[in-house]
Amino acid sequence: MSSPESSTESRLAALEARVTELEDLNAIRRLQWAYGYYIDYNRPEEVAGLFAKDGAVVFLSGEYVGYEGVMRLYGTWFQNLFTGGRRGPVHGLLLDHFQLQDVITIAPDGQTAKGRFRGILAGGWHDDILKDKPEGMPQQFWESGMYENDYVKEDDVWKIQRLDYMMQWQADYETGWSKTVAHLQPAAQCFPENPIGPDRILPDTQVRQTWPHRAEVPMSFAHPVLAHSFAVGDFTKLQKKWP
């Protein structure tokens, strides 16, 4: 029979572990939310500072690797397309990235984690700056995508290891998603041939087509009740009663 002291120590250790997990969840949530705010106002250096030393971003089926890759995407690609090379908010330009619906799973060792978030983007150019709108883009648009991200704790601070954004749909604000074909298409050429291209392109079997194409996004989390992680195409059998 265990002594009262050992029982108390066990309970305290269990409580400490639970508190640590809650703190980790909130730290990762705060990290991802901060990412959204920084890209809203075109702050690429701050965005890059959220990533681990060997961090990477997957965007439009291309992978941008390390600090140089992250800065090429957020500091060069986005600036060339949206802000004319300017840092910070631009008069008349709307690029709000909402980070929502998180499901975060901390690894047993507390050093890595996976997180699924939904992103919604409201974007567009006011009439005042319509001349700055890139050719081929709608003046006002919506976009939504899924993040399936990896996080790592470096020097006791949570950072983004791999941010994997999978676009789900785009919509011209005036005409709606039923009449929209995505103005962004999968990457076709790597850096340096394409000065704003990714460091590598995903294998053909992993390339993600954009709207109106639809595909299931792998889920990193276990079912809250059935305690099982479901792979793409892995559906629970129909049942006549609750399990």
Task: For each feature predicted by the language model, list its residue ranges.
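Outer-membrane beta-barrel translocator domains and adjoining extracellular loop/strand segments
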Residues: 128-130, 175-176
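Terminal "cap-and-tail" regions of soluble proteins that handle hydrophobic small molecules
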Residues: 2-25, 135-138, 154-243
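Transmembrane beta-barrel outer-membrane domains
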Residues: 26, 93-95, 140-142
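A solvent-exposed, acidic/Ser-Thr-rich amphipathic alpha-helical stretch
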Residues: 44-124
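Short, solvent-exposed loop/turn segments at secondary-structure junctions
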Residues: 122-126, 168-169
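Short, aromatic-enriched amphipathic alpha-helices that serve as compact interaction elements
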Residues: 24-40
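Hydrophobic/aromatic beta-strand elements that line small-molecule binding cavities or substrate pockets
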Residues: 99-104, 146-152
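Short, P/G- and charge-enriched loop/turn segments at secondary-structure junctions
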Residues: 88-92, 132-139
